[in-house]
Amino acid sequence: MPNIASASKRLRQNEVRNLYNRKIKSFLNTQKKKVIKAVDSNDKNLASEEFKKYASALDKAARKSVIHANRAAAKKSDMMKKINAMN
């Protein structure tokens, strides 16, 4: 248990931020699974639509500092490579 008031406040803030970050990361994983499912089904139109949603979610997470901006860019790049490799 923290002895200093500011440490107690930081503990409370970290708990709230942890819940928020977990929620956002879970949403990102769900969006990623949707894109991968579309890629596996060889539906390029569906994959493109799902990718737009995924890219938007990644950008928002990066803007809110849930993930680093470079990490978001790398994830978008990897997913685009999978989509472009489709027949």
Swiss-Prot record:
One of its GO terms (biological process) is translation. Pfam families: Ribosomal_S20p (PF01649). Signal peptide: none annotated. InterPro entries: Ribosomal_bS20, Ribosomal_bS20_sf. One of its GO terms (molecular function) is small ribosomal subunit rRNA binding. GO terms for cellular component: cytosol; small ribosomal subunit. Keywords: Ribonucleoprotein, Ribosomal protein, RNA-binding, rRNA-binding. NCBIfam families: S20 (TIGR00029). Binds directly to 16S ribosomal RNA. PANTHER family: 30S RIBOSOMAL PROTEIN S20, SMALL RIBOSOMAL SUBUNIT PROTEIN BS20C. Belongs to the bacterial ribosomal protein bS20 family. This is Small ribosomal subunit protein bS20. It comes from Brachyspira hyodysenteriae (strain ATCC 49526 / WA1). The lineage of its organism: Bacteria, Pseudomonadati, Spirochaetota, Spirochaetia, Brachyspirales.
